[in-house]
Amino acid sequence: MFSVHPEPFTLIARAGSGISSFEDLRGKRVNVGNPGSGQRATMEVVMDAFGMEMGDFALATEFKGSEMAKEICDGNIDAMIYTIGHPAAAIKEASTTCDVELVSVTGEPIDKLVADNPFYRVATIPGGMYAGTDSDTTTFGVGATFVTSATVPADTVYVVAKAVMENIDDFRNLHPAFANLDPAQMVADGLSAPIHEGAMRAYKELGLMN
């Protein structure tokens, strides 16, 4: 139906770890995400883009999202990755418990990923959102999407889609990650499936689509 907030691929490193780019993870202890998770899948995509393998890390751990903050603050890992909307509780926990910093993930490999895959986009995490990171962090990510089944009646989808777009200010207030949503982008960017006919009718009426 529409895309929502971006979920940036986020690299969090212990302060003083010597990690200032994705490639600096070589020789470090890195949480790569638990098997079968979206975190792990995205990490493997990025590793492949940079020509890296698990063996390039001094240690590759598989902690869940709920475990990562404790592990990095206990000194068991040097860095963790998390693809999530911001602000994120796990990153807040880490940044308020110990000295960590967000690291930008950029370069030609990322530019190519974004260019080759319509579901990826450049993403920015505002500076000051987390303790220890005062400047903006540039990375890439996916857009969370609001989906429905193709079998749902068009009139039902029409009502929902129109209500969201006509009340976008109220929708933005539902979660901090929604604060900067732009209806024009929501109906055009980061969509990996066709727009339902009911939603399309609503968007055309509202002038969001031709």
Predicted regions mapped to residue ranges:
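Ligand-binding clefts/hinges and TM-proximal coupling segments of bilobed small-molecule sensing domains
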Residues: 35-45, 120-188
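A broad, structure-centric signal for solvent-exposed, well-ordered loop/edge residues
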Residues: 8, 20, 32, 109-112, ...
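Acidic, polar ligand-binding/catalytic clefts
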Residues: 1-5, 85-88
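Pocket-lining segment of extracytoplasmic ligand-binding domains
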Residues: 54-152
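Bilobed "Venus flytrap"/periplasmic-binding protein-like clamshell domains
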Residues: 3, 7-74, 169-172, 185, ...
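Short, low-complexity, polar/charged sequence segments that are solvent-exposed and flexible
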Residues: 18-19, 30-32, 49-52, 82, ...
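An extracytoplasmic/periplasmic, membrane-proximal ligand-sensing/linker region
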Residues: 67, 74, 84-102, 112-115, ...
